[in-house]
Amino acid sequence: MILNSRNNLFNFKFPRKFIPIEVADKYRKYLNRMPGNLITEPIDFINYSIQGIAIPGIQFDPVEQAPNDGTITYHRGSIPIQNTIERQFQVELQLLDGYINYWILQDTLLYYYSKSNRKPFTDDLKLQILDAEGIHVMSAVFEKPILNSIAELELNMSSNIAEFNTFTLNFYYNKFNLKLEID
């Protein structure tokens, strides 16, 4: 029997150096103060809160031609494939107590766009897809990514219930490599 795919069979973590040292140092003391917290490094806290990743599909716009018979025919365009794919993806994260992971990532975004930062890209990001037995089926590497935006944070005084909420980070990447890992 062939099983249906499960949406949670993936592994995506930000690399250890994704949170700059300046930002990590700023939040480490707070994380160590949290009662019952086993996570002391900001990058581990961020990776813990990852809920999902959204990758746009691939779409090619056809070229329309209208021959003399009044019909329209469609053909493949001549634009190189790499220029037709929307090279961006989103990472969804759970909002944690005090919105601390939101503030860490906001500071990270501001760091990457500050004039003092000479590094044009973040480290490559890797997504691993697993099968039902936890075996790696394929890996996707987003090369030379840039953190582009962080979604808005909505606060509301009329709701005082702790509930599951998420926010998203948007990335653009320059190259996408797929590696099949089936032996």
Question: Across the structure, where does each feature detected by a protein language model lie?
Answer:
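Glycine-rich, low-complexity intrinsically disordered segments
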Residues: 1-183
